[in-house]
């Protein structure tokens, strides 16, 4: 069986550059959009639909009984701008919007927890469940 080859070495997200160019999203507007999206649910995950680490973090939360709001940046017309702003928030200075390394990015209770390594470290050291309880994502 022949599998389709994924040619996305970089995160190009949406090939419709006309949509991207007409958005005129400035960094402050993008940050406000991220804040708004992060506040819509107790747990919010910024993800890419084809990313295995993003899939793993979604499985982790769903396995814990949490229903996160998931924003697949490769499916959003303004996903590149959101990704760039998330990279800035994480303190990533290299890679730009073509580096998927910072994804997934998780917000709990409207506050950024961080990328995969921070979430997994919190899970391992036992601080993730209290965060989820405080945010109202877990009741037990």
Curated annotation (Swiss-Prot):
It is found in: Cytoplasm; Nucleus. InterPro entries: GlrX-like_pln_2, Glutaredoxin, Thioredoxin-like_sf. Keywords: Cytoplasm, Disulfide bond, Electron transport, Nucleus, Redox-active center, Transport. Residues 31-139 form the Glutaredoxin domain. One of its GO terms (biological process) is negative regulation of DNA-templated transcription. A motif (Responsive for interaction with TGA factors) lies at residues 137-140. Weakly expressed throughout the inflorescence apical meristem and in young buds. Localized to the tapetum and middle layers. Gene3D superfamilies: Glutaredoxin (3.40.30.10). Disulfide bonds join 51-54. GO terms for cellular component: cytoplasm; nucleus. Belongs to the glutaredoxin family. CC-type subfamily. Has a glutathione-disulfide oxidoreductase activity in the presence of NADPH and glutathione reductase. Reduces low molecular weight disulfides and proteins. Involved in flower development. Interacts with TGA9 and TGA10 in the nucleus. This is Glutaredoxin-C8.
């Amino acid at each position: 069986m022949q599998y389709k080859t994924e040619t996305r070495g970089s995160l190009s997200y949406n090939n419709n550059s006309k949509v991207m160019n007409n958005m005129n999203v400035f960094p402050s507007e993008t940050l406000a959009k991220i804040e708004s999206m992060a506040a819509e649910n107790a747990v919010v995950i910024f993800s890419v639909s084809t990313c295995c680490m993003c899939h793993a973090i979604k499985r982790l939360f769903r396995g814990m009984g949490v229903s996160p709001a998931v924003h697949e940046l490769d499916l959003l017309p303004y996903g590149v701008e959101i990704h760039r702003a998330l990279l800035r928030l994480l303190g990533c200075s290299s890679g730009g919007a073509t580096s998927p390394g910072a994804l997934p990015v998780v917000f709990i209770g409207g506050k950024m927890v961080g990328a995969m390594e921070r979430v997994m470290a919190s899970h391992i050291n036992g601080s993730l469940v209290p965060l989820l309880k405080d945010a109202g994502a877990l009741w037990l």
